[in-house]
């Protein structure tokens, strides 16, 4: 959101890239699950796929800063930037996690001794879909609100790591220790690089259910100017000392037009959307509380940040 915003193009690109990664992963997973594959071999391969998923998911936070810094100043159109950024971030994690399902499905069919392959395959499809639904609902309604998008990515990486470890423990008796050490080194190296680049710090000052909110100084306007950015766009610019000083021409126009129409009478106004509350704040100051002003903002975090 802080880089390309949240739009139909953003979600379309992300969904398409994730589905593409899963599709290629399913194909490769089928190749890694031939008829002669043994249970321990299959579980070990699934474990490595999950380990790669954990590392590539953790790397999302690093790649986001790096790739975005290259794409944003470029002359590419916004849709191209969104597609390239989505591919760089989400293809590999989706690809690696897509490998797991065909392998486990093959092992489940073998364990059933081929008596009900259709039932087993249908069950695996159903469980995979239910897992996708559960992950979507938990991320959208709980985890992003609770621990933010960065915390959610770290949590997903931790879950993949835990699953990889469990598959290593079950599938690889002799090589378990070396596998675990290698996984630890991969995760540690990625984590150290991310910490050095401050990739695990959220770019948002406040991450609400609706927006990535940032409050920054705007010295190019005035030493006392402050701006509010919602996602990737500057929403409002206010002066922390003089409420009646407008930096946005359209707000200045509304203020002057209202005074010409209303004269010296205090306005009675209903604001749909508060944002930085530039005009309500100015009119409260100018009319000394005599104006009848109602401002409605859907996001309480935006209101709190503005105040």
Please describe what each predicted stretch is.
Residues 1-207, 214-225, 230-237, 255, ...:
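Alpha-helical transmembrane segments of multi-pass membrane proteins
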